[in-house]
Amino acid sequence: MGLLDAAVSRQNVLVTSVDSVLNWARLSSLWPMGFGLACCAIEMMATNASNYDLERFGIFPRSSPRQSDLMIVAGTVTMKMAERVVRLYEQMPEPRYVLSMGSCSNCGGPYWEHGYHVLKGVDRVIPVDVYVPGCPPRPEALIGGLMKIQELIRMEGLGVSRADALKKLAEAESDPQPLIEEARKQKTA
């Protein structure tokens, strides 16, 4: 038993790592910038409406890239628009995340074969963290993608790179048991 154990057990003191506090603050206050380019933008607006209420998850939309930490690319990205997508992405402060919403921004959508003017996926110009499939995806699917971003933030840390966190998230989707056990260990520690 250490010197502080008695003092901590008698009072309401919470002991945790700085890493987990920072991640909790970041995942509890996502500020997405919507980049709506086509019909997926309508579903993105519906997700922000009172029926789904993204603010209950701590997600507050912003219109400036300098105030956001998440870019939601929703819709068809043309070759001319790709330069602007990159410029807005570069204006976002670190750490920044990208969610690709819908078939058009994921892979070119119905224009992938004959659309010479359409980018065949926004991941060709900026790194994408989470893909939300659908044409257009329902608001529930977008909320699911935002939850994946929050899980990614929870897994990141001072010693954990984003690539490692993405790998761990992919493994957790196939077998969630190790992730559940790790969360239990963190709660008891």
Swiss-Prot record:
* Record keyword NAD present: yes
The cofactor required is: [4Fe-4S] cluster
A Pfam family this protein belongs to?
Oxidored_q6
Listed GO MF terms: 4 iron, 4 sulfur cluster binding; iron ion binding; NADH dehydrogenase (ubiquinone) activity; NADH:ubiquinone reductase (non-electrogenic) activity; quinone binding
The species this protein belongs to is Chlorobium phaeovibrioides (strain DSM 265 / 1930)
Keywords for this entry?
A: 4Fe-4S, Cell inner membrane, Cell membrane, Iron, Iron-sulfur, Membrane, Metal-binding, NAD, Quinone, Translocase, Transport
Concerning SUPFAM superfamilies, the annotation shows: HydA/Nqo6-like
Enzyme superclass (EC): translocase
Gene that encodes it: nuoB
Example GO biological process term? aerobic respiration
Checking InterPro entries in the record gives:
NADH_UbQ_OxRdtase-like_20kDa, NADH_UQ_OxRdtase_20Kd_su
Function noted in UniProt: NDH-1 shuttles electrons from NADH, via FMN and iron-sulfur (Fe-S) centers, to quinones in the respiratory chain. The immediate electron acceptor for the enzyme in this species is believed to be a menaquinone. Couples the redox reaction to proton translocation (for every two electrons transferred, four hydrogen ions are translocated across the cytoplasmic membrane), and thus conserves the redox energy in a proton gradient.
Which terms in the GO cellular component ontology are assigned?
A: plasma membrane; respiratory chain complex I
| Mode of membrane association | Peripheral membrane protein
Q: What is its EC number?
A: 7.1.1.-
Cofactor annotation comment: Binds 1 [4Fe-4S] cluster.
How is this protein named in the record?
NADH-quinone oxidoreductase subunit B
Tell me where it mainly resides. Answer: membrane
Q: Which family does it belong to?
A: Belongs to the complex I 20 kDa subunit family.
Residues annotated as binding [4Fe-4S] cluster are 39-40, 104, 135
PANTHER family, from UniProt? NADH DEHYDROGENASE (PTHR11995), NADH-QUINONE OXIDOREDUCTASE SUBUNIT B 2 (PTHR11995:SF33)
Q: Which reaction does it catalyse?
A: a quinone + NADH + 5 H(+)(in) = a quinol + NAD(+) + 4 H(+)(out)
* The keyword NAD is assigned to this record: yes
Identify the taxonomic lineage of the organism of origin.
Bacteria, Pseudomonadati, Chlorobiota, Chlorobiia, Chlorobiales
Subunit structure, interactors included? NDH-1 is composed of 14 different subunits. Subunits NuoB, C, D, E, F, and G constitute the peripheral sector of the complex.
Subcellular location(s): the record lists: Cell inner membrane
